[in-house]
């Protein structure tokens, strides 16, 4: 749900130019995330290419959070697919081609598990010299939301995350300590639903579904996790942070991710 909002936000921000999007298995399987990404692009009236990515983590079994996002990954909301055929090129190849066509300029935003990015960095070792930066939603300075130690995106594929953080590409991490502050409450998405356009209506439906689950665990709103790295690219002045070395635990069953 917040992935869909992040795409709509990126499309709406005049500071950003979208080159392409990719899908990866995460909270929902690739069989949902790939067509859903195409549906959102179609909804906003754009024609950005959407590339299929990894169906599972590099070394581990996938994790699915169906309760939060519904069986179809969009809270049960049905949207039409675009009439154009799906892109056949794998996400990791498309990423490399895009970076190679504009060396030092491409800013990559990652809002899911880092499997696609890690595969691309491994397959194309020079990719790390071609990317301008990676801005990602993942991790947390303190605590997690999947285990006491880990946030979902990193926990889902810690091996991929370790590859990305060790790559040397300048990386900005928007962790839970940041994203949990970016919260929409019921009055917010009800107001958006009243805007009278397709995107506002979708936001109201998506967060209505998420709220039916989240409200039962004591939270006061729905965190906009994936919008944070998108907003950071357009308005970095809204954020503060610090430099840190990051190591991803890939072995311990207690602190994985």
What are the language-model segments listed below?
Residues 1-39, 72, 77-181, 186:
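Active-site histidine-anchored catalytic micro-motif
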Residues 6-12, 17-18, 155-159, 174-257:
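Conformational coupling and interaction surfaces
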Residues 23-26, 53-55, 249-251:
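Acidic/polar N-terminal loop/beta-strand segments that form early-domain functional surfaces
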Residues 40, 44-51:
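A glycine-rich helix N-cap at a beta->alpha junction
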Residues 45-47, 103, 243:
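Short secondary-structure junction motifs
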Residues 50, 164, 230:
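A residue-level signal for conserved active-site and pocket-lining positions in enzyme catalytic cores
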């Amino acid at each position: 749900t917040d992935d869909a909002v992040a795409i709509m936000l990126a499309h709406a921000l005049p500071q950003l130019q979208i080159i392409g999007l990719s899908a990866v298995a995460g909270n929902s399987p690739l069989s949902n995330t790939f067509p859903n990404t195409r549906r959102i692009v179609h909804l906003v009236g754009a024609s950005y290419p959407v590339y299929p990515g990894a169906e599972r983590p590099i070394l581990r079994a996938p994790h699915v959070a169906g309760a939060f996002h519904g069986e179809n990954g969009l809270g049960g909301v049905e949207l039409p697919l675009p009439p154009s055929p799906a892109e056949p090129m794998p996400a990791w190849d498309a990423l490399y081609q895009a970076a190679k066509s504009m060396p030092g300029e491409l800013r990559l935003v990652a809002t899911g598990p880092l499997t696609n990015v890690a595969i691309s960095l491994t397959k194309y070792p020079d990719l790390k010299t071609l990317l301008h930066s990676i801005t990602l939603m993942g991790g947390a300075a303190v605590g997690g939301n999947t285990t006491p130690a880990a946030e979902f995106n990193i926990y889902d594929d810690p091996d991929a995350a370790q590859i990305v953080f060790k790559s040397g590409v300048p990386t900005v991490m928007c962790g839970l300590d940041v994203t949990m502050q970016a919260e929409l409450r019921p009055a917010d998405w009800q107001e958006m639903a009243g805007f009278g356009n397709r995107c506002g209506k979708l936001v109201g439906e998506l967060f209505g579904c998420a709220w039916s689950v989240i409200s039962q665990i004591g939270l006061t709103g729905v965190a906009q996790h994936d919008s944070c790295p998108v907003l950071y690219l357009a308005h970095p002045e809204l954020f503060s942070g610090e430099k840190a070395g990051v190591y991803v635990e890939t072995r311990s069953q207690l602190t994985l991710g």
